[in-house]
Amino acid sequence: MLDRFREGTWAFYRLGERSAFAELARTLIDAIPADDPTLALDLERLNAIKRARAEAAAEYFRENAARWHEIRSLHVPEQDVEAALLKLLPTCGIQDLLDLGTGTGRMLELLGPKVERALGIDLSREMLAVARANLERAGLRNCQVRQSDMYQLPLASASFDAVLVHQVLHYAEEPAEVLAEAARVLRPGGSLVIVDFARHDQETLRTEHAHRRLGFGDEEIAGWLFAAGMTPGPVVRLPGDPLTVNLWPAVRNAAADATNIAQAPVPALSTSGVT
């Protein structure tokens, strides 16, 4: 009934989405009275934990906004990631680009000159202040940034040709919801690229840098993409020491039926390396 994902010293559980018992589990949950006192206490505690995590992440961003590039460089050379991204993302013909969790706006600086319009979304005002300064310095008038929650984008459906999720998914409490929202704003045939860490056991990234997830597995990402109405492409891997950065590309299906897609088996993903 449950899927279990081990990450360092933590383990996450969620309802199995593809098992034969998934429907039974949902039925049992629906049968629990909404006013059950034990359930109410559990939900109250869960919300408190989520608030504490959000506050810790916000504080981390406030303390590190000015040296964000320096922190990222501790994990993997950014120039390697950027070179791989430029090879992977078909920037030619892109009118509207969305960068979720834009941070200092580096991805807008990189891709802005290659697209007609680009928008960066971030929840941190400190990060947005840095991004605005960087974009102004680069003279990128076609790029803008906006404060918004990546779970509830104030954007019309099917309004972007490409969406980038660069080193932000590991901060998300619900990565699948982030990808579903990214898919919603993508036009049919639009491109999505996720840049994040492969699964690892570097617990300090959770305890000292507010990472909610210690990387991701290919099948995990593929399942979320299919459920959101997207088709995954070959994974690009950039091995590092000790972390590996993966680039997971996907294309928005022309006529996505998320329910049917979510029930389809996830095929094995081919991979490629970039040196």
Predicted regions and their residues:
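Amphipathic alpha-helical dimerization/coiled-coil segments
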Residues: S19-R67
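A short acidic, Gly/Pro-enriched loop at the edge of an enzyme's catalytic core
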Residues: Y151-A162
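A short glycine-rich, Lys/Arg-flanked "PGG" loop and its adjoining helix->strand segment in the class I
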Residues: A176-S191
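A short SAM/SAH-binding and catalytic strip from SAM-dependent methyltransferases
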Residues: D161-E174
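Core SAM-dependent methyltransferase catalytic element
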Residues: R237-T275
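Class I SAM-dependent methyltransferase SAM/SAH-binding core
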Residues: D96-Q152
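C-terminal alpha-helical "lid/dimerization" subdomain adjacent to the S-adenosyl-L-methionine
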Residues: S191-W248
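Conserved alpha-helix/loop element of class I SAM-dependent methyltransferases that forms part
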Residues: H75-Q95
